[in-house]
Amino acid sequence: MNWLLVIAGAAAGAPLRYLTDRAVQTRHDTVFPWGTFTVNVTASLLLGLVAGAAGAGAPPAWVASEQVVSLVGTGLCGALSTYSTFSYETLRLAEDGARLLAAANVAGSVLAAFGAAALGAALARAVWG
């Protein structure tokens, strides 16, 4: 039954990724992929919250349930974030001669996503731990 929850989460996450990416990117007049950066960091924060809540045994019990992890963690966050687009956009930056932006995208994305996941987990522990 959890596979249905993963599908439901992904059905929400994929269009949310597209809409967020377009909304963010159209507000920036740059080749830097701010839309992809935003969805990846947001998904990392949300996944940190979900994993932190599950690890802390958050009450009510549904918050830390396997179903919520499947729906939000695997489904929504999995579809919201996009490693393949991040990789392709970084490659495109490098091939177009924007090597500094490509390097900034790699370093910034990894650091920001890791920081967001850690922040999400810390917030969950502060609330439910």
Curated annotation (Swiss-Prot):
It is a multi-pass membrane protein. GO terms for molecular function: fluoride channel activity; metal ion binding. GO terms for cellular component: plasma membrane. Keywords: Cell membrane, Ion channel, Ion transport, Membrane, Metal-binding, Sodium, Transmembrane, Transmembrane helix, Transport. The keyword Membrane applies. Na(+) binds at residues 78, 81. GO terms for biological process: cellular detoxification of fluoride. Belongs to the fluoride channel Fluc/FEX (TC 1.A.43) family. This is Fluoride-specific ion channel FluC 1. The gene is fluC1.
